[in-house]
């Protein structure tokens, strides 16, 4: 099987694709904002000016599954429990899920995650130097952050921090390379690379259940991880293969790291 594949299918059909279980499930969940997606964003109006009238984005969802009918959280966790690799006997090797989500979704996600066998969670807050809520700037404090929740079963997940502290509250990591924007809520590749590098090793499997443009797969490919994604919208899948897939550049340092570790295992450094 190829190392990087974006399936034009629902993650609920994962069995038919015969993919391996994941060390890390990394997904940007639908925030279920519906027609309020662009509510405080200048794009609501033509040219960002309300005197010009509403634009085509007014009262429009980012995509037609961004509501509670189009995306069911209990079903999502039911399938994720099967997609993530089983709890290992040893320590420091357990898998985990990292889900980008809205702050308002925290309690609902934690509830259904616990029911699916993931009672433990760690929140992340990513600080931005800007806010998309420009229209509310003279009315109230505006949001300049994004959130994520890390879920795990019992044992703490694999953690490769290279001896450095990883803060739960950190700066939003921007791309230094200009990547094509294919999806309205596309996350920076550099941020995804940081998370993948921290919670997986070379050749581990990363799965994105709601892949959108496929930047998770691009980030995983750059780091020599195997990655599989699911996306039901054909235009996003086509955009990934046409524009992002050709940009994957495997990191030679990661390959050397893997070769060194393999040799150390042969010599008995790891039990």
Where do the PLM segments sit?
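Short, conserved active-site loop motifs that form the nucleotide-linked donor/cofactor pocket
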Residues: 3-4
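A conditional alpha-helix N-cap/helix-loop micro-motif detector
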Residues: 7, 69-73, 185
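Conserved SAM/SAH-binding loop
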Residues: 8-13
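Class I S-adenosyl-L-methionine
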Residues: 17-24, 35-48, 81, 96, ...
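SAM-dependent methyltransferase catalytic-core segment centered on the flexible catalytic loop
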Residues: 18-95
């Amino acid at each position: 099987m190829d190392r990087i594949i974006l399936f034009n299918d629902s993650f609920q059909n994962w069995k038919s694709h015969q993919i391996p279980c994941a060390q890390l499930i990394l997904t940007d969940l639908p925030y279920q904002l519906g027609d309020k997606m662009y509510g405080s964003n200048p794009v609501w109006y033509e040219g960002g000016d309300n005197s010009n009238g509403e634009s085509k984005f007014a009262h429009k969802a980012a995509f037609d599954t961004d509501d509670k009918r189009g995306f069911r959280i209990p079903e999502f966790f039911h399938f994720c429990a099967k997609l993530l690799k089983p709890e290992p006997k040893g320590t420091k090797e357990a898998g985990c899920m990292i889900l980008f989500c809205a702050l308002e979704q925290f309690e609902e996600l934690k509830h259904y995650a616990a029911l699916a066998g993931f009672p433990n969670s760690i929140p992340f807050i990513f600080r931005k130097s800007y806010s998309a809520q420009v229209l509310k700037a003279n009315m109230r404090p505006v949001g300049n952050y994004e959130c994520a929740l890390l879920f795990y079963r019992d044992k703490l997940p694999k953690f490769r921090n290279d001896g450095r502290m990883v803060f739960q509250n950190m700066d939003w990591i921007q791309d230094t390379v200009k990547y094509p924007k294919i999806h309205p809520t596309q996350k920076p590749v550099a941020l995804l690379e940081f998370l993948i590098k921290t919670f997986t090793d070379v050749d581990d499997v990363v799965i994105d259940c709601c892949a959108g443009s496929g930047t998770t797969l691009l980030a995983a490919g750059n780091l020599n991880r195997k990655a599989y994604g699911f996306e039901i919208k054909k235009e996003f899948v086509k955009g990934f293969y046409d524009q992002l897939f050709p940009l994957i550049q495997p990191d030679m340092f990661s390959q050397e790291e893997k070769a060194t570790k393999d040799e150390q295992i042969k010599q008995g450094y790891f039990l």
